[in-house]
Amino acid sequence: MAEAEGESLESWLNKATNPSNRQEDWEYIIGFCDQINKELEGPQIAVRLLAHKIQSPQEWEAVQALTVLEACMKNCGRRLHNEVGKFRFLNELIKVVSPKYLGDRVSEKVKTKVIELLFSWTLALPEEAKIKDAYHMLKRQGIVQSDPPIPMDRTLIPSPPPRPKNPVFDDEEKSKLLARLLKSKNPDDLQEANRLIKSMVKEDEARIQKVTKRLHTLEEVNNNVKLLHEMLLHYSQEYSSDADKELMKELFDRCENKRRTLFKLASETEDNDNSLGDILQASDNLSRVINSYKTIIEGQIVNGEVTTSTMPDSEGNSHCGNQGALIDLAELDAPSNSSPALAPPTSGIPILPPPPQTSGPPRSRSSSQAEAPPGSDSTNNALSLLDEELLCLGLTDPAPTAPKESPGSSQWHLFQNEPPSDLDFFSPRPVPAASCPSDGPQLPPPVSTSSMSQAPLPAAFPAPVVPASAPTHSTGSFMFSSGPAPALAPKAEPKGPEYPSSSTSHRLDALDQLLEEAKVTSGLVKPVSCFSPGPTASPLLPASAPARPLLPFSTGPGSPLFQSQGSPQKGPELSLASVHVPLESIKPSSALPVTAYDKNGFRILFHFAKECPPGRPDVLVVVVSMLNTAPLPVKSIVLQAAVPKSMKVKLQPPSGTELSPFSPIQPPAAITQVMLLANPMKEKVRLRYKLTFALGEQLSTELGEVDQFPPVEQWGNL
């Protein structure tokens, strides 16, 4: 984030640690420190940049980076101290001095300076317990033999605490009004100023009383949690006395009451108040000890809670597992303790059929899942807000399965019994392709319309569009479903020429007319030759089948089949029946989300995926996120969408239909739903939606329109 003068943290640091510098350039070092104080996330970004520079193979660059770090610790205050005091950054410093990492390749000058900095921080920042732990571990491992001498000019002197400010008297409007009234010589203005001062003093007293009550509540909560936790550690069902059990029951009741008090405190506290973090931490500790009591004493099974998590120590430092862990140099050669990959669920997701044979490599659900690292820490560091939503929501939706196909003869009868009016060239229904010339392979009986609409290609194996000439399983307009192959037509005996019945000829006339319509729309249709080479699967008919067409089409010079020399295939693919995009395979784009609906705490956002589905560059993948920040539950949520006739829209099943009420100590509840939007004509997208839901007990129906979609030319590369 560039601030004044167009400088960013990275540019300041690059100039301050430039290897071509003859000496330390304090102008850029101080500029880097000032930039940290200006930016909201300055300390977090700074420690990441400094860790990279400190591990530089160039000694002078690493030494300058350590000088910058030392200056930042003196000038950037508590926010930077907290970031440096985390294991995430301390581990990077340990790697510099450890021979099992970079210690053998780093100069002694750099390693000595790192050790001096760590030792000086243990003296100047006793509240940062993790720095002390890291330094003592280095001493236990023999990397640090003795404490280094620290010159006075290198000693970290904590900056004085900022002057306490009174938020009541810092109100700019009231201060200006008070100054104007005091300058006035009108007695009425002076009386008004007196009343204003009294009201401001009362507000300040109320604020102080509120802060005092909050501190008292937090202290009482911490004492109860600590005492109950210690009693639970020493609890034994056989040897614990009744008095101990009564005391634990009393402490448990107090904790239950205090939890409601903390909820109220959190809801009354402003988001930018520093005490909100203390309230949330106390609430977490309270929830853990309550769940531990229910598990140990009452024998209840508490879902989703780790009852063995540690409580805060006497200094108030919580050693939770999610805070990271210090590198144990003594056990680096042992197998890592990373959490194993989650086993695939055994229920809820039906087994998918084998993938169809296509010319392109199939993509499976397992391959996309295997790319994700098993550890949750790296995932949390790499993912944005949208990634977290996609990982946490909607992953257990059952995948669509392909129903069994009926035998080929019954499919053929279904086709014959279908009225000719249902043969719509531009509809998503499958249409039988015209047969090839006499020496080409004969086409099998087409599948029924119902089987095409009910048996989409499994989500784990999206297949590319294949030319009509290739007798493979595909989901194109003129191809067959991804289900089992239809039964082969029986071998025709060499009898006299047979002609279809009158009803069959009626169907043939309709199909002939269909081909004529395809000829008229030649601007959109790209004919594909039946003899075009390409990877094909096994023939659908035996090689011994006679070489006459399955249907007696005329192939004279005037017939459309003769003129097109192949099966007509429509150019713009509109159907989305066979397109399914699993939520976990979606990659978020850099495009900003669009707010489609935002009323009464119920909000709907459109997030755009980075890539299009395989073989469908005209389809935009949209992840619809529904969030609830209202104090009431939202139920029976149904979202419907409509687009112009030249486009097609499809909504996949949502991850849920209900949203729980908003809680100030938990992230807002959310629902995700994947929406596919086909736009083969590359027109401007205008989408209308209908949203029905129940907010509390009130039913609502909302209509809206969204036209802020990414440019069509950028689809697939957002």
From Swiss-Prot:
Where is it located? Golgi apparatus, trans-Golgi network membrane; Endosome membrane; Early endosome membrane; Recycling endosome membrane
Q: Which UniProt keywords apply?
A: Endosome, Golgi apparatus, Membrane, Phosphoprotein, Protein transport, Transport, Ubl conjugation
Q: Where is the GAE domain?
A: 589-710
Region annotation Disordered: residue ranges? 334-381, 395-455, 477-506
- Chain segments carrying region Unstructured hinge: 299-588
Query: May I have one GO cellular component term?
Result: trans-Golgi network
The record's section on SUPFAM superfamilies has:
Clathrin adaptor appendage domain, ENTH/VHS domain, GAT-like domain
Q: Which Pfam families match?
A: Alpha_adaptinC2, GAT, GGA_N-GAT, VHS
Q: Motif Autoinhibitory — list its residue ranges.
A: 387-391
A Gene Ontology MF term for this entry? phosphatidylinositol binding
Boundaries of each GAT domain copy?
Answer: 171-298
Which segments constitute the VHS domain? Answer: 16-146
Instruction: Check the record and name the InterPro entries matching this protein.
Output: Clathrin_a/b/g-adaptin_app_Ig (IPR008152), Clathrin_app_Ig-like_sf (IPR013041), ENTH_VHS (IPR008942), GAE_dom (IPR008153), GAT_dom (IPR004152), GAT_GGA3 (IPR044111), GAT_sf (IPR038425), GGA1-3 (IPR027422)
Describe the protein's quaternary organization and the partners it interacts with.
Monomer. Interacts with GGA1 and GGA2. Binds to clathrin and activated ARFs, such as ARF1, ARF5 and ARF6. Binds RABEP1 and RABGEF1. Interacts with the membrane proteins M6PR/CD-MPR and IGF2R/CI-MPR and the accessory proteins SYNRG, EPN4, NECAP1, NECAP2 and AFTPH/aftiphilin. Interacts with TSG101 and UBC. Interacts with ADRA2B. Interacts with NTRK1; the interaction is independent of NTRK1 activation and ubiquitination. Interacts (via VHS domain) with BACE1 (via DXXLL motif).
Physiological role: Plays a role in protein sorting and trafficking between the trans-Golgi network (TGN) and endosomes. Mediates the ARF-dependent recruitment of clathrin to the TGN and binds ubiquitinated proteins and membrane cargo molecules with a cytosolic acidic cluster-dileucine (DXXLL) motif. Plays a role in protein sorting and trafficking between the trans-Golgi network (TGN) and endosomes. Mediates the ARF-dependent recruitment of clathrin to the TGN and binds ubiquitinated proteins and membrane cargo molecules with a cytosolic acidic cluster-dileucine (DXXLL) motif. Mediates export of the GPCR receptor ADRA2B to the cell surface. Involved in BACE1 transport and sorting as well as regulation of BACE1 protein levels. Regulates retrograde transport of BACE1 from endosomes to the trans-Golgi network via interaction through the VHS motif and dependent of BACE1 phosphorylation.
Q: What is known of its domains?
A: The VHS domain functions as a recognition module for sorting signals composed of an acidic cluster followed by two leucines (DXXLL motif). The GAT domain is responsible for interaction with ARF-GTP, UBC and RABEP1. Required for recruitment to the TGN it prevents ARF-GTP hydrolysis.
Q: Which family does it belong to?
A: Belongs to the GGA protein family.
The molecule here is called ADP-ribosylation factor-binding protein GGA3
